[in-house]
């Protein structure tokens, strides 16, 4: 029951005052927080006690959730919102007073001695790492109704993104444990940040597939909550137009991963277990594990607290640039600056041409691909100071130039890669640049949008993402000495792409270049129309001439040699229209499917030595 003090406090809001008898002491405290922060409008339409009581209690359940899931609670959320909305209204630039310069980092070229050494070092470090996948999104923007991690990475084998990620982590785990001198086995923790949209479907995908070979105890799902929407510049919380007892909510952004890790207690547990690194990555870049061993090697060698994986970036390209920003007061930070902010920032800082390509043909500011490697100790220390909170931003859509009313409610947002914004200048923050063909092929645009992309710019579609995998694998084998025939150009779903030989392999076959080189010898060649899928570990390619389709699946104790001339009718590629609803979504968004006319397929389930020749 509410005390006299409470009654006096709430007397200015009669509709709430008359309902105090319904509320628990905790709920009364939450009501106080709301009133102290300018939210009395939430109760204006409340009827007297005895009417809709269940709905009123449900309202406070939601308020309790919103309060507990945000660092500092709703009071902190509303305070930050008021500040950011005031800045937005006057057009304040968050980078005022800052000058950009190129930070220090490591540029790696695939196949060089330095690259190979960094890969080897990265494998050694892998058992000291935890992997965090940020997977809160559905595939609607792609024209796919499932969760994005369930989408096939490529359709030669049909392996989905999540399976590929898990098998890559397991391959690194095994290789790293083998190298470690004390002979101990350590399981690499794998964390998946989900949302209301993806949580149950991600869990179902894992359980239906026995976690793709990972121990269920290795995998932790952390679900992010949404945040309250804001109706106006006073940061008044927005009610659902169809339910006066419910606050409108929207996703807060992938920056939530830091507060979730902080509150989960996992960071402390990992430190106790001797872990040293936390790797963050996003849900649909099918090439990213090509870059992880070497970038982890760079982190260990350079002792970076923060290492952003990056790719060469053309000036003004629509991808954030990693920049060192130095303020007139002397403080500095190394962060991702969005492309539309980088150019004006440079022009305002004495670079009249803004963001331009240097003698390399690329911008000196490398392109951020949202993959971070953080050193665990300093990361945990920093989160203890911030409670896991990340610098936020707000992006209201105003009705007109007075900037007094919004077209629709807005909310605060945060991004995973903004973590370094709160770090002291002494923090060692760097980057690792790798070839785009090796490391970056995100799948985020639907066929219609991808077809509108200006020629020469990346499509970032399911079509280009799959073709990039075949290109990367073909180029890796070329550098290992295989004569892989050059690609042909083809238009699929309105996008002109290079079609290379359809070559895929399981991560355990070759996680790093030096391992792949050991498995290839003699004179090998693969024609452009060929398909080759290697699903075993101990498969060796020697003097192979492939013109057709070859699928090899073998247990670890089977040693398999692929050689001689293997020629058959192979698999053909058939165009599919993305509007053709008779075709499954995951196929039609690519614009093609395989017609498996003929192949040589070997499944070896017994130990021993085998030779596969036509």
UniProtKB/Swiss-Prot annotation:
GO terms for biological process: nucleotide-sugar biosynthetic process; pollen development; UDP-alpha-D-glucose metabolic process; UDP-D-galactose metabolic process; UDP-glucuronate metabolic process; UDP-L-arabinose metabolic process. GO terms for cellular component: cytosol; pollen tube. Its cofactor is Mg(2+); Mn(2+). Its EC number is 2.7.7.64. The keyword Transferase applies. Disruption phenotype: Plants produce collapsed, nonviable pollen grains. Male sterility. Ubiquitous, but most abundant in rosette leaves, inflorescences, stems, stamens and pollen. Keywords: Acetylation, Nucleotidyltransferase, Transferase. One of its GO terms (molecular function) is UTP:galactose-1-phosphate uridylyltransferase activity. Optimum pH is 7.5-8.5. Inactive at or below pH 5.0. Gene3D superfamilies: 2.160.10.30, Spore Coat Polysaccharide Biosynthesis Protein SpsA, Chain A. InterPro entries: Nucleotide-diphossugar_trans, UDP-sugar_pyrophosphorylase, UDPGP_fam. It catalyses: a monosaccharide 1-phosphate + UTP + H(+) = a UDP-monosaccharide + diphosphate. The keyword Nucleotidyltransferase applies. The modification N-acetylalanine is found at residue 2. Optimum temperature is 45 degrees Celsius. Belongs to the USP family. Required for the synthesis of the intine, the pectocellulosic inner wall of developing pollen. May function as the terminal enzyme of the myo-inositol oxidation (MIO) pathway. May also play a role in the salvage pathway for synthesis of nucleotide sugars. Can use a wide range of substrates including glucose-1-phosphate, galactose-1-phosphate, xylose-1-phosphate, arabinose-1-phosphate and glucuronate-1-phosphate. This is UDP-sugar pyrophosphorylase. The lineage of its organism: Eukaryota, Viridiplantae, Streptophyta, Embryophyta, Tracheophyta. The gene is USP.
């Amino acid at each position: 029951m509410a005390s006299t003090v409470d009654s006096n406090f709430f007397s200015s809001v009669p509709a709430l005052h008359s309902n105090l008898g319904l509320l628990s002491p905790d709920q009364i405290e939450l009501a106080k927080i709301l009133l102290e922060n300018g939210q009395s409008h939430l109760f204006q339409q409340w009827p007297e006690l005895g009417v809709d009581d269940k709905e009123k209690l449900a309202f406070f359940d939601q308020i309790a959730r919103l309060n507990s899931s945000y660092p500092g609670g709703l009071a902190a959320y509303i305070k930050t919102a008021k500040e950011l909305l005031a800045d937005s209204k006057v057009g304040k630039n968050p980078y005022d007073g800052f000058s950009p310069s190129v930070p220090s980092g490591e540029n790696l070229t695939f196949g060089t001695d330095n690259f190979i050494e960094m890969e080897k070092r990265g494998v050694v470090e892998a058992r000291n790492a935890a992997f965090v996948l940020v997977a809160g999104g559905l595939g609607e923007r792609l024209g796919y109704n499932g969760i994005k991690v369930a989408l096939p990475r490529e359709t030669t084998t049909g392996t989905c993104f999540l399976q590929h990620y898990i098998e890559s982590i397991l391959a690194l785990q095994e290789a790293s444990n083998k190298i470690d001198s004390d002979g101990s086995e350590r399981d690499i923790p794998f964390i998946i940040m989900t949302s209301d949209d993806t949580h149950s479907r991600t869990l179902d995908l894992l359980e239906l597939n026995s976690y793709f070979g990972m121990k269920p105890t290795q995998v932790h799902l952390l679900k992010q909550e949404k945040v309250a929407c804001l109706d106006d510049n006073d940061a008044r919380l927005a009610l659902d137009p169809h339910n006066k007892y419910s606050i409108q909510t929207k996703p807060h952004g992938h920056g939530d991963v830091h507060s979730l890790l902080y509150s989960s207690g996992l960071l402390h547990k990992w430190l106790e277990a001797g872990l040293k690194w936390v790797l963050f990555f996003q849900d649909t870049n099918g090439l990213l594990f090509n870059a992880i061993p070497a970038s982890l090697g760079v982190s260990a060698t350079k002792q970076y607290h923060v290492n952003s994986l990056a790719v060469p970036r053309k000036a003004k390209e629509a991808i954030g640039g990693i920049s060192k920003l130095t303020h007139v007061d002397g403080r500095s930070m190394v962060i991702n600056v969005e492309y539309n902010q980088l150019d004006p920032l440079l022009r305002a800082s004495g670079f009249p041409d803004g963001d331009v390509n240097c003698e390399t043909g690329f911008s000196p500011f490398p392109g951020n691909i949202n993959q971070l490697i953080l050193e665990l100790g300093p990361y945990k220390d920093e989160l203890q100071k911030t409670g896991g909170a990340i610098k936020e931003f707000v992006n209201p859509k105003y009705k007109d130039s007075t900037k007094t009313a919004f077209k629709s409610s807005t909310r605060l947002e945060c991004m995973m890669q903004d973590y370094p914004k709160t770090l002291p200048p002494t923090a060692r923050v760097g980057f690792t640049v790798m070839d785009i063909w090796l490391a970056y092929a995100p799948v985020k645009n639907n066929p219609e949008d991808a077809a509108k992309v200006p020629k020469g710019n990346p499509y970032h579609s399911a079509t280009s993402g799959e073709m990039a995998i075949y290109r990367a694998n073909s180029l890796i084998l070329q550098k290992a000495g295989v004569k892989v025939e050059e690609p042909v150009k083809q238009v699929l779903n309105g996008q002109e792409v290079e079609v290379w030989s359809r070559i895929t392999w399981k991560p355990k076959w070759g996680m790093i270049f030096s391992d792949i080189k050991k498995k290839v010898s003699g004179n090998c060649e693969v024609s452009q129309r060929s398909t080759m899928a290697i699903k075993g570990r101990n498969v060796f390619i020697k003097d192979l001439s492939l013109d057709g389709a070859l699928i090899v699946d073998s247990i670890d104790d089977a040693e398999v040699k692929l050689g001689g001339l293997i020629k058959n009718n192979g698999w053909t590629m058939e165009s599919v229209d993305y509007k053709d609803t008779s075709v499954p979504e995951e196929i039609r968004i690519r614009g093609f499917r395989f017609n498996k006319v003929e192949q040589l397929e070997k499944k070896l389930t017994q130990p021993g030595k085998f030779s596969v020749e036509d």
